[in-house]
Amino acid sequence: MDADMIPKFTTKEEEIDFWKALSLKYKKSYKEAQEELLEFQEGSRELETELETQLGQAEHRIRDLQADNQRLQHELDSLKEKLEYQYAQSYKQISVLEDDLSQTRGIKEQLHKYVRELEQANDDLERAKRATITSLEDFEQRLNQAIERNAFLESELDEKESLLVSVQRLKDEARDLRQELAVRDTRSEVTRMSAPSSPTPDNDKTDSAVQASLSLPATPLSKNLDNAFTSQTVLANGSTNAALTPSARISALNIVGDLLRKVGALESKLAACRNFAKDQAARKNYVTNVNGNLINGDISNYSHSLHTSYFDKARTVNGLDPGDGTHITAPPRSNSPSGLVLSV
């Protein structure tokens, strides 16, 4: 206590009371402080015990956490290695995929170009197809016309074969008539030599018949064919011994000439048909070269072989060749009044 704070006492009792009261005060404060110290020491011991317990728990926890930390560190290292490996693999895979993507894009562009080219080629093929169909329809139309014409020619060939048989018979008849005329010429010559000044009425009739036959055109085949076959039947059967009249002979000769002319016309038709088949074959080859061999060439070959076979068949029937120039004509009038010269 400071000296300035000590009061001044008047008496010693006051001073003793003052110091006695002050000592009691300090004693009381000492007791209170001692009690507080004991309480503090007890609390400190309890707190120390508690702190030691907590420290042990904390150390145990630290050890556990360190173990966990080490374990996690090992896991982290392994995960880092795996991550690095996965990153490397992913980088490689991404590189490969990028290469594949670039190649795929290139292939896609090529496919787009190829598709455009295919579309253009398809358009060209469609146009060529339409042109080919048009050409094929035209060819089929021409082929049908050729088939119809061939059928018509077949019928004419059949008619020609029958006519060739008739011509051969008429040639035989003409040969017989020529021989008969030669005999009649001989007889007429003998008769003329025996009576030169008086010609017979038969010779006059013969001369007039010959002149009439020379002045008249050829008799149509359709009108005189029945007469010719009737005359041939009469000669073949020997139903009459009388000789044919000069007009009948001239009519038969005219029929033979008409038959031969018709045979020549048929030969010319066959030649024209053969030329038509050659034209069709040339057209077929042209269409095949333009459209890529779309038309089979066997049809024209068949048509050509058909015409050739018919043409050869017509040439070989009865040994008659269309180019041999076989004709029967009415010869000019001879110097003798009754002589007739026939040529086959």
Curated annotation (Swiss-Prot):
Which of UniProt's keywords are assigned here?
Coiled coil, Cytoplasm, Cytoskeleton, Microtubule, Phosphoprotein, Transport
Compositionally biased spans, kind Basic and acidic residues: 181-190
In terms of one coarse class, where is the protein primarily found?
A: cytoplasm
Entries under InterPro entries matching the protein = NUDE, NUDE_dom
What post-translational modification information does the record give?
Phosphorylated in mitosis.
Q: Name one GO biological process term.
A: establishment of chromosome localization
* One GO CC term, this protein: microtubule
Q: Does the keyword Zinc apply?
A: no
Top-level taxon in the UniProt lineage: Eukaryota
Q: Which sequence ranges form a coiled-coil region, renumbered to this chain? A: 26-187
* Cell location: Cytoplasm, Cytoskeleton; Cytoplasm, Cytoskeleton, Microtubule organizing center, Centrosome; Cytoplasm, Cytoskeleton, Spindle
A GO molecular function held by the record: microtubule binding
Segments for region (Disordered) = 181-209, 322-344
Q: Which family does it belong to?
A: Belongs to the nudE family.
Q: Main role?
A: Required for organization of the cellular microtubule array and microtubule anchoring at the centrosome. Positively regulates the activity of the minus-end directed microtubule motor protein dynein. May enhance dynein-mediated microtubule sliding by targeting dynein to the microtubule plus end.
Q: What is the name of this protein?
A: Nuclear distribution protein nudE-like 1-A
Q: Per the UniProt entry, what species is this protein from, by scientific name? A: Danio rerio
Per UniProt, what is the name of the gene that codes for the protein in this document? ndel1a
